[in-house]
Amino acid sequence: MSRASGIGSWPGADVRQALSAVRELLSEDGLPYLPELPARGPGADIIGRGAGLLAELAVDLQPMGWRFVDRPGRDAHRTSALLRQDLDELAEAFDGYHGDLKVQIAGPWTLASSIWLHRGERSVVDVGATRDLIASLAEGLRVHLDELAALVPGAAFVVQIDEPGLPSVLSGELPTASGFGRIRAIDPTVAAEGLRDVIEAAGDRHTVVHCCASEVPLPLLRDTGVKAVSLDVALLGPKSWESVAATVESGLDLWAGVVPTDATDAKVTEVIDPLVAAWRSVGLPLSDLTRVTLTPACGLAGLTPEGARSVQRLAVDAARALTETAGS
């Protein structure tokens, strides 16, 4: 059966209200998730939140962004406090819950390209620093998942690894600190190994890598051990769809970002018809649409709470319609 979920971000600063909305909309036949509320400021953003999970590595917020430091400062403590609040509210909102429940973390290459070293360059330029970051993230994820399992013992946790920075790391498009140069591209084999280390830290839990770029390195992702890929399908051309077909045929599931975040009044057919047409065009059987999870095209933080509810509800309705299409 096709089902719906979300990318992760949600508008506003009230995590209790956000969790209530997510559970109401998705717990029946969708995949609910721990919403992220970046409007709360530093530490609630994707990089700060991800850096806060790192084991034995301290970060703090500097004018250039998050940077490794010798000991955690005020911003790192704020990050920890925000996560603690979210986990406490999650435990209350999902008390007695049994089923799948998704959490999101920033991926190793997005973190390595966004967290700065002491000397004022991105971590990704330093092989040793990148290796330490990956190991730290893997250990931090293990600890995080153990805590989540204790808080919501009836949940089967799904881990979404957000890698918006992966294409830039692979293409050598990241600017240096001076802005006059570009950082050398990371070898795809090295990138796959780094992702694999983090994915393995999730154990036997279902994992999905989310990347909302137009050129997602699907062959690389197929070699990481991930169970699914999450894409903004509106950005995919015919060549990319051929790679999607190869990915699905290799056994990975597709999370299709089909609901535009401005589509609060769209019809279900407007959402699923382009997906079904592309699916057919690459020779995939309609019956395999049951392996597709439908999501908004990206996070919902830029909407109003009412708008976020509308977009998320449309994804739920579209997933039900897609299930009917798969059985036709």
Regions found by a protein language model. Name each.
Residues 1-130, 220-227, 252, 290, ...:
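Alpha/beta catalytic barrel-like cores
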Residues 75-92, 131-146, 269-275:
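Glycine-rich anion/phosphate-binding loops
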